[in-house]
Amino acid sequence: MGSGKERDTFVYLAKLSEQAERYEEMVESMKSVAKLNVDLTVEERNLLSVGYKNVIGSRRASWRIFSSIEQKEAVKGNDVNVKRIKEYMEKVELELSNICIDIMSVLDEHLIPSASEGESTVFFNKMKGDYYRYLAEFKSGNERKEAADQSLKAYEIATTAAEAKLPPTHPIRLGLALNFSVFYYEIMNAPERACHLAKQAFDEAISELDTLNEESYKDSTLIMQLLRDNLTLWTSDISEEGGDDAHKTNGSAKPGAGGDDAE
C-alpha cells in the first residue's frame, strides 16, 4: 500500500488536470490511487468518475453524430459516404472499447475488492453497469449480448446492495435507479420495465423526502427530476407505440435517445 503523501499527490494532480480539462491525465492520476488498493473517499470516487465520464463522453457524442449522419446518407442512397462513415465509426468504437476495458480492469482488480462499505459497493458496481451499457450501445450480435448481460448483472448487484444499505433518497441509489432504467429502455428495449423501475424509485424517494439532509437535497432532487422527465418521455412513447414490442429495433440500441442518465 502506498503512503498517504503519495495518495495526496495523485489526488491533487487529478484536481489540477480537471481544472485544465485534461481528462486523460485526470484518469491516469486516479487510476494510480485505485491501484493503492484502498477504499476511495467520496471526493476520490467523484474525481475518478468525472475523469472517465469526460474521456468516454466525447467519444459517445461523436459516435452518435456519426450514426445519425450515416442513417441520413443511407436514406439518400449515398453508399460511398456510408462506407466512409462506417470506417470512421470503427475508429471511435475502438477508442470506446479500450476505455471501457480499462475501467473494467480497474474496477474488478482494485476498486470493487477494496470497497469496504455499502456506498462504495453500490457506486462501483453501478459504474461497472454503466460502462458495460456504453459498450452495448454500439456493439452488435454476441458482443452486444455479452455486454448487456454483464451490465444487467452489475446493476443487479448494485441494486441489492443499495436496497440493503442506502435510503431511497440517497443520490447514489437514485442515480443507480435512473441509469438502470435507461438500460432497460435503451439496451433491453423494455420501456414498461424501465418505467416501473423509475416510478418505483421516484415514489419511494418522495415518501421519505422530509428525511433528506441539506447536503444531499440538491443532488437527490435533481436526479428525481431526471427520473420524472424520463417517465414523462417514456410513458408518452408507450402510449404512442403500443408497448414493448414496438420498441424493438433489430437488437440495436439508440444511444442517448432513451432519456437522461446520471453522472
From Swiss-Prot:
Task: Look up keyword Metal-binding and say if it applies.
Answer: no
One cellular component term (GO) for this entry is: nucleus
Q: Where does this protein reside within or beyond the cell?
A: Nucleus; Cytoplasm
Region annotated Disordered, chain positions: 239-263
Q: Which domain of life is it from?
A: Eukaryota
Q: Which UniProt keywords apply?
A: Cytoplasm, Nucleus, Phosphoprotein
Give the PROSITE patterns listed for this entry: 1433_1, 1433_2
Tell me yes or no: is Phosphoprotein among this UniProt entry's keywords. Answer: yes
Checking Pfam families in the record gives: 14-3-3 (PF00244)
Function field: Is associated with a DNA binding complex that binds to the G box, a well-characterized cis-acting DNA regulatory element found in plant genes.
> Self-association or partners: how does it assemble?
Interacts with DREB1A and DREB1B in the nucleus.
This chain's protein is named 14-3-3-like protein GF14 mu
Q: Which organism is it from?
A: Arabidopsis thaliana
Q: What is the lineage of its organism?
A: Eukaryota, Viridiplantae, Streptophyta, Embryophyta, Tracheophyta
Q: Which gene encodes it?
A: GRF9
